[in-house]
């Protein structure tokens, strides 16, 4: 039969590869970065949640911004440029995990991987809307799966909508899993005046003054 499959409302997840060496940044994280426990899952995060303001991360920040422009303007075709807001390091020792969560007050989120290998658990994306009925599946794909395990390599950045639920299973390796996460937002406005959806941040700040 003649047929056409249409993928409605696809969720864009982009992976980009950092080509430069990042040993200096990783060495800084391992030796100088202060960590605090992040919840009850035996994982840690950096005390500093604005790490990309530090000069040592300037090359990585430029790579993140370039990747964001590809994601936002070439894939999503949006006009308002995204800027990085908070940024922090995740430190997952052996036997730790990362609970399911989203990133509120952010549009697109990113995770850069400093130290991962094939023995470590991949990031897991979970379906936002549940399937109404459980049916027996003989082969899983993007239409019938409730979660998606995405293997990542060191030096890769992954970008995804901040509303997308994600988690990390227990680290069963004997090494620390180290990554850097960041959130984004616009600096000027959201929406469109013509469509009556405009939120002009600069104008709001002027009124406050």
Task: Please report, for each region that a protein language model flagged, where it lies by residue.
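Short, solvent-exposed loop/turn segments at secondary-structure junctions
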Residues: 21, 117, 130, 164-166, ...
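Catalytic core of non-heme Fe(II) oxygenases with the double-stranded beta-helix
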Residues: 89-159, 190-196
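A generic structural signal for short beta-strands and their flanking turns/coil linkers
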Residues: 83-87, 106-108, 176
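Catalytic core of Fe(II)/2-oxoglutarate
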Residues: 140-209
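Short helix-to-loop capping/linker segments positioned immediately adjacent to catalytic or ligand/cofactor-binding
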Residues: 75-77, 96-100, 111-112, 166-170
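Short clusters of hydrophobic/aromatic residues that line enzyme substrate/ligand-binding pockets
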Residues: 50, 123, 168
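Non-heme Fe(II)/2-oxoglutarate
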Residues: 1-80, 88, 196-204
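Preference for bulky hydrophobic residues occupying beta-strand positions
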Residues: 16, 89, 112, 182-184
């Amino acid at each position: 039969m003649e047929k056409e499959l249409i993928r409605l409302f696809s969720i864009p997840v982009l992976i980009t590869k950092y080509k430069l060496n990042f040993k200096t940044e990783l060495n800084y994280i391992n030796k100088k970065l202060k960590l605090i426990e992040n919840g009850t899952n035996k994982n840690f995060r950096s005390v500093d949640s604005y790490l990309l303001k530090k000069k040592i991360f300037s090359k990585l920040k430029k790579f993140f911004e370039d990747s964001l422009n590809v994601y936002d303007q070439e894939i999503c075709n949006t006009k308002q440029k995204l800027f990085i807001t908070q940024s922090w390091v995740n430190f997952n020792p052996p036997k730790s995990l990362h609970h399911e969560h989203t990133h509120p007050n952010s549009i697109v989120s990113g995770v850069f991987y400093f130290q991962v290998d094939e023995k470590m658990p991949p990031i897991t994306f979970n379906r936002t809307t549940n399937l109404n009925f459980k049916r027996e599946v003989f082969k899983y794909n993007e239409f019938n799966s409730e979660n998606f395990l995405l293997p990542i390599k060191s030096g890769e950045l992954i970008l995804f909508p901040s509303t997308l639920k994600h988690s990390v299973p227990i680290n069963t390796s004997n090494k620390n899993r180290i990554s850097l996460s960041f959130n984004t937002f616009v600096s000027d406005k959201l929406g469109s005046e013509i469509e009556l959806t405009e939120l002009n941040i600069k104008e709001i700040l002027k009124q406050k003054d």
